[in-house]
Amino acid sequence: MMAKAKALIPDNGRAGADEGNRQAWIGQEVLRREDRRLLTGTATFAGDLGVPGQLHMRIVRSTQAHARIVSIDATEAEKTPGVRMVITSEHTRHLGSVLLEELGYHEIYENIEDFSHPVLAVDKVLYVGQPVVAVLAVDPYLAEDAAELVSIEYEPLPVLLDPEEALTGKVELFPGRGNEGARIKKAYGDIDRAFAEAEHVIRHKYVTNRHSGVPMEPRAVVVQPDPARDTLFIWGTVHVHDNRRIIAKMLNLPEVNVRMKHVEIGGSFGVKGGVFPENVVAAWAARTLGVPIKWTEDRVEHMTSTSHAREMVHKLELALDAEGRILGMKDEIFHNHGAYFRQAEPLVSDITAGIVFGPYRVPAYDATLHAVFTNKTPVGAYRAPGRYESTFARERIFDLACAEIGLSKTEFRRRNLLTAEDLPWTPGLDIVHEPYHFDSGDVVKHFNEALEAANFSEWLEESKRLRADGRKVGVGLGVLMDKAGLGLFETGGVEVSRAGRVTVKTGGSSVGQGIETVLAQIVAEELQIAPENIDIVHSDTELIPDGVGSWSSRSTVLAGGAARKAALAVVEKARRLASEMLEADPDDLELTAGSFKVKGTDQQISLYEIAAARDPFTARADNDEPGLAADAVYMNNAMNYPYGVTLVQIELDPDTGGHRILRFSTSTEAGRVINPLTTRGQIIGAAVQGIGGALYEEFLYEEDGQPITTSFMDYLLPSAQEMPNVDCFVTEDAKSPDNPFGAKGLGEIGIIAAGAAIASAIDDAIADGVHTDRLPVTPEQIFSRCQGLNKAER
């Protein structure tokens, strides 16, 4: 059944209501403005672009997981008609590897550049799919044919795939530097005392296997040079300001000579973020040859070369008192980064180590994370990176604890979740150099309300009745906590034109989350105009000199905060000008329907009329700036930590190992909802991906490092047919005090606890004493357990 949502977002008297004479746009279900161009096929993607005279780039990728490059023979490829150049590391060696220090990661990881990704492989390859050679030709088919003529001789080396084995030293991927890029320690409290005084100590190992976002649209980039000005125009990247900064430095260009331009990039989910080596090769080639370069990856390339995610091992230990209250938690984590560090991923290891304890009262905590390298595709961020994996481990060991000490899953959570009296919770560790600060809320209260809203007790009773009738039906849950708003600033600008339009510029980017719609609502409320009169400009470094971008559920709070700040500055300037033009006291002016009105009179002037009156000559005569515009930088004091619970009821088919999710509910404390429609959409989309990671998706490898899952024939994705109805229960009881909206990030909520809740429900359905400790759960595993082929084990 197609995923849909039950409307369980409270109105609170705001949505669509007027506050006095002011129109409240925040809280309304405004339709996404992005959807029309996407649904009608009028949106422009990088793959749609065609620049006269462009060459097409094809990458020759490694066929070996670990090998020395003995020789490269491109003679036949270079002879092919239509081929303009064959690029190897001899051309790009001087560029080095994709820079990481430019993003500040060296503050977390010492010597991080030792492990960054080469532009093209130099002397050796570390994974199947690594770029080795680039072929440029006049059309993509010639480029592909010529690429197949490139002959590369390899000397195979021992292959390393297991993250725990990476620390044994049997195989070194980086000779003299080992396979551990970093070791991260996070701790607070007296962990030794906690375990010494514990009545119950529970230990278990949990594994989340490798999968990723696999968006419909693969990566693509177009680079157009302007040789006269030594300038590059680049389309097709997510984080435009990071790409500009890094590509400019690698090519030894001033940043102003690299101009990132907006184009639709489709779904990202984190996996398209950062700077990829192919982008650098395309930029270098365009500048070197003075002609446009276009590159689009195919699906096999995407599955083997675009960032993977999720592969972690958690060796978790839990200390409890006699009543089942948590005394302490220890975790040793092995994070499989694949062959190199990529842009986003160094942050994920740090976040993971600092967030395993979740929204619980944990007096003592000690986590050590090993960021290790293997001969697999490098990993990157994927929706709720670090949170999905750590939540699975934590919630699963809590279920194990419930079985050992005789508590229900719900009662154990109630005894240990944070309450209003516990907050703010600042235990004394940092996440990415920011002190962990759980600012507001009441997790226990929300937990109880979410269970009641879903009628969870009925789920439990129904499942018992159905099991008594011989059906394999079970119920599971997982409590979640997200970390949102990473990256402490964002830029924005608002300009009112005389033509009756408002332009909002933002350093954020559109990756499918509806940022254009939400920013229009935020600015509309401050200017008191309709959102449809507002245009949003983003992802263009010529128009927006600086910015951070959209990731880590930060757009509403940070991009929205910057847009609101700029809008307020416009309102204040307009109020001053209106008071002069209407000869009225500023305090007697009220802004409604886009116009300043003098209270008690019919005198008024619109924002557009004020903008028109501030032409350069008039403004100069008044010693004022022309126009009606303002730019702003919004600085956030801290990240925010939304929380919630995911509930699942599942039925298993013992004869096939198949499964059907009967009910799925996810809740969150939102602080404040800007647009209920986009909120539900984000929760549903994330839930679908969480179900995929729990039951369907996995990148598999042969023992020699050859990838098995290289197409959608092998890599399973849930379709609409497999999706349950998704109920969303969203409360607005705990506004975050650290941002002007009181909002918390919501883009990743639906995915975080999906794996944990589904695993919990599967164990409940089978009730064989076996503890699910690995994702995804396959039909083969379910069949085996239902047929009694597994012995109970922990």
From Swiss-Prot:
Described purpose of this protein according to its UniProt entry: Molybdo-flavoprotein enzyme complex involved in nicotine degradation. The subunit gamma (large subunit) contains the substrate-binding sites, the subunit alpha (medium subunit) binds FAD and the subunit beta (small subunit) has a 2Fe-2S ferredoxin-type domain which binds 2 2Fe-2S clusters.
Entry EC no(s): 1.5.99.14
InterPro entries tied to this protein: Ald_Oxase/Xan_DH_a/b (IPR000674), Ald_Oxase/Xan_DH_a/b_sf (IPR036856), Ald_Oxase/xanthine_DH-like (IPR016208), AldOxase/xan_DH_MoCoBD1 (IPR008274), AldOxase/xan_DH_MoCoBD2 (IPR046867), AldOxase/xan_DH_Mopterin-bd_sf (IPR037165)
Record keyword Oxidoreductase present: yes
Record protein name field: 6-hydroxypseudooxynicotine dehydrogenase complex subunit gamma
Gene: kdhC
Key word Ion transport present: no
GO BP annotation list: nicotine catabolic process
Naturally occurring in which organism (per UniProt): Paenarthrobacter nicotinovorans (Arthrobacter nicotinovorans)
